[in-house]
């Protein structure tokens, strides 16, 4: 047996052990895996510096931005929905135009017609989150409004009358979206406690 075949068979024998160790760690929970492995496998972040810059500029939690991106597009900067939403943060072109007309974004740097550009998409998506934060009272309301619209969430807030806000949500899709984004927000906050661009 030549050296190359011997190395292959040695590697092949250890592969099942490596897989078993990985599966055991997963069954025990991701807390037993090295943090960098958890980050890269389960909670990746692309465009960390762009997110950090936009978060500071608009006073929005960068973990929230990452959670929205994860749930909206799965970090696919070319994602397009059947409804016409575009890019990382799945913005509707009309929404970007409205944000632009309100003067929330520097249109000399970020053209609202260029939502497939990750930096532009993050800028407009974060500006939208910032606008919703100013209009609404809680992070849950902001997340729900990003999905269902500001007017709808304001109606739900009025109807909640002291109940937990999530109980007043009448759209199953938005209720599920709120749960998913909140879970992603918890995980990004846990695994990136010092920020997205600090690894």
Placement of each model-derived feature along the sequence:
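Hydrophobic alpha-helical transmembrane segments of integral membrane proteins
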Residues: 12-13, 145
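Catalytic glycan-binding domains that act on GlcNAc-containing polysaccharides
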Residues: 30-199
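N-terminal Lys/Arg-rich, disordered targeting/topogenic segments
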Residues: 1-11
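Hydrophobic membrane-insertion alpha-helices, especially the h-region
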Residues: 13-31
């Amino acid at each position: 047996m030549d050296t190359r075949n011997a190395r292959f068979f040695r590697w092949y024998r250890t592969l099942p052990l490596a897989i078993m160790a990985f599966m055991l760690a997963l069954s025990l929970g991701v807390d037993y895996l090295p943090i960098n492995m958890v980050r890269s496998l389960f909670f990746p972040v692309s465009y960390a510096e762009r997110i950090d810059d936009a978060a500071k500029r608009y006073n929005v939690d960068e973990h929230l931005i990452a959670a929205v991106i994860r749930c909206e597009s799965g970090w696919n900067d070319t994602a397009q929905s059947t409804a016409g939403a575009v890019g990382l943060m799945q913005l509707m072109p009309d929404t970007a135009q409205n944000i632009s007309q309100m003067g929330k974004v520097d249109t000399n740097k970020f053209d609202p017609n260029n939502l497939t550009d990750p930096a532009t998409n993050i800028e407009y998506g974060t500006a939208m989150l910032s606008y919703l934060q100013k209009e609404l009272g809680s992070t849950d309301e902001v997340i729900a409004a990003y999905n269902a619209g500001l007017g709808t969430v304001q109606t739900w807030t009025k109807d909640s009358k002291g109940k937990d806000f999530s109980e007043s949500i009448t759209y199953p899709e938005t209720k599920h979206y709120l749960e998913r984004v909140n879970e992603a927000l918890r995980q990004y906050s846990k695994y990136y406690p010092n920020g997205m661009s600090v690894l």
